Design a protein with these regions (language model features):
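Generic structural signal for well-ordered alpha-helical scaffold segments
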Residues: 174, 178-179, 206-207
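PLD/PLD-like phosphodiesterase catalytic module centered on the HKD motif
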Residues: 1-175
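Walker A/P-loop
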Residues: 183-205
Length: 207
């Protein structure tokens, strides 16, 4: 990376732990005025705001984001492209910019060296250019809107079945409790196995 003329990162996810591992290198690249483009995405809302904010601090890096919520298309690419004097090196595989991807995960990545006139390289760069044009600049407005959206998602709890129904034990117990109340009884003791639903039974009874 430090010996390259320019670089392009095209990854689905970026988190702060991954950016931290690259800070020293990015600082050296900035000092050497080696420019780069980084494209990431909102796919699964996994890319972290803090990571994007940190990357924006580097004057030599252009940062854009592909908004999957806008296009309704998943973005799962992982490629790293390095330009040298007479050739390119391209790494394509499974690694996002995360600490776990760089250090601990089982990841499969393939590096290939390509001449600048190589047709395969031209296809890769053209595809990246198309994605770049379809993405958004990571500016303050985007960051605030994305942060608001992500926070909203965190506040929502996913429940597969919205309506909770009584099981056999609970239904039977509720019927017997009702019989006791009809007889003006004010006390009852319920004994049931662990995990059978006593807490929910209490809630159903209160309801």
């Amino acid at each position: 990376l430090l010996e390259s003329k320019s670089f392009v990162f095209n990854v689905a996810f970026i988190n702060f732990s991954g950016v931290q591992l690259l800070l020293d290198v990015f600082s050296q690249l900035e000092n050497k005025n080696i420019k780069g483009k980084i494209l990431t995405s909102t796919y699964l809302n996994f890319t972290q705001i803090k990571a994007l904010e940190k990357l924006k601090e580097f004057s030599n890096i252009e940062l854009r984001i592909y908004d999957c919520n806008h296009t309704n298309i998943g973005f799962h690419a992982k490629s790293y492209i390095f330009e040298f004097e007479n050739f390119y090196e391209v790494i394509v595989g499974s690694s996002n910019i995360t600490a776990s991807a760089f250090k601990t995960n089982i990841e499969w990545n393939v590096k290939t060296t390509l001449k600048k006139e190589d047709e395969f390289l031209k296809n890769i760069l053209n595809e990246f250019d198309n994605l770049w044009k379809d993405s958004f600049e990571v500016n303050e407005e985007f960051l605030r809107n994305y942060e608001f959206f992500v926070n909203q998602q965190k506040e929502q709890t996913f429940i597969y079945k919205q309506k909770i129904k009584t099981n056999f034990m609970q239904k039977n117990a509720l019927e017997k409790l009702e019989i006791l109340r009809q007889k003006d009884q004010t006390k009852a003791l319920i004994i049931a196995a662990t995990g059978s639903g006593k807490t929910y039974l209490s809630a159903f009874d209160v309801k």
